[in-house]
């Protein structure tokens, strides 16, 4: 197993725990992604599985008015582009480069060469106030799932996407307990945050189930996000 991440300390610790290798990679950098794949393949060989999880977000309205001063501002285009570059272009960059590597492998007995799982979000379908960039990036990941699966079908490479709801991630771990509890209570059932092992179980199912291809699946406890 090889882990790509921008957080070197956390990445090295997790790679050690899992018995894998760590490569410091910024998915917006062509050079770093290329170097990451080269280092990973030198250490463990050409991958047959890729799971893309890199992502970031912000909360800025398309245009807004300051309640105190009346000043009007719009979403900074540079901030919008940063979200697109990390979430969408970074996902596609890693997908394309991994698929090209998988194509060099001999097919397995069932004709398969590899499987790719990308990560979108329920915000792809239930975007909230201030999430224009984030929702656009995640909706685009959903939108490109089937075309990429069709691009790669002749090479025996499957592509699927997970749309997680509210998960217990390091980002949420820093929130006050009352906020975390309110988020958990907003989930229809079960009334709790999603757990990383539940994401992993669905990703594993997508990877190991040969007939599963070109699909985007919500994993969200039946939540439908409110406007805010």
Question: How would you name each of these model-derived features?
Answer:
Residues 195-219, 224:
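C-terminal substrate-recognition "lid" of short-chain dehydrogenase/reductases
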Residues 121:
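Residue(s) in the substrate-gating loop at a strand-loop-helix junction
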Residues 61-81, 183:
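Substrate-binding pocket helix/loop in short-chain dehydrogenase/reductase
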Residues 95, 137, 145:
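Active-site helix of classical SDR
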Residues 8-9, 25-38, 77:
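The beta1-alpha1 cofactor-binding region of Rossmann-like NAD(H)/NADP(H)-dependent oxidoreductases
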Residues 1-13:
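Conserved glycine-rich Rossmann-like NAD(P)H-binding loop of the short-chain dehydrogenase/reductase
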Residues 100, 149-151:
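Alpha-helical segment proximal to the catalytic Tyr-Lys
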């Amino acid at each position: 197993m090889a882990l790509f991440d921008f957080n070197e300390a956390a990445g090295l610790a997790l790679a050690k725990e899992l018995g894998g290798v760590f490569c410091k990679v910024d998915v917006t950098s062509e050079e770093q992604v290329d170097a990451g794949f080269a280092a990973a393949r030198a250490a463990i060989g050409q991958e047959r599985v890729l799971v893309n999880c890199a992502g970031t977000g912000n909360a800025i309205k398309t245009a807004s008015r300051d309640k105190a001063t009346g000043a009007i501002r719009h979403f900074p285009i540079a901030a919008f582009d940063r979200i697109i570059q990390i979430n969408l272009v970074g996902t596609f960059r890693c997908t394309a480069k991994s698929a090209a590597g998988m194509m060099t492998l001999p097919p397995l007995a069932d004709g398969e060469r590899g499987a790719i799982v990308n990560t979108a979000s329920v915000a792809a379908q239930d975007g909230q106030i201030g999430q224009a960039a984030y929702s656009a990036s995640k909706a685009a990941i959903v939108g490109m799932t089937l075309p990429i699966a069709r691009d790669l079908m002749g090479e025996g490479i499957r592509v699927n996407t997970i749309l997680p709801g509210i998960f217990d991630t390091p980002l949420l771990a820093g929130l006050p307990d009352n906020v975390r509890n309110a988020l958990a209570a907003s989930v229809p059932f079960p009334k709790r945050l999603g757990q990383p092992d539940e994401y992993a179980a669905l990703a594993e199912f997508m990877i190991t189930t040969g007939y599963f291809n070109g699909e985007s699946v919500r994993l969200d406890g039946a939540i439908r996000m409110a406007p805010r």
